[in-house]
């Protein structure tokens, strides 16, 4: 998925992308 690196493993994104 095309998420910028600083946000890729942000907790809020991990909720959706794990």
Curated annotation (Swiss-Prot):
Keywords: Iron, Metal-binding, Oxygen transport, Secreted, Transport. GO terms for cellular component: extracellular region. Its main location: secreted. It is found in: Secreted. GO terms for molecular function: metal ion binding; oxygen carrier activity. Major yolk protein. This iron protein may play a role in the detoxification of free iron after a blood meal. Belongs to the hemerythrin family. This is Ovohemerythrin.
């Amino acid at each position: 998925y095309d998420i910028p690196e600083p946000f890729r493993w942000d907790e809020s994104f991990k909720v959706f992308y794990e």
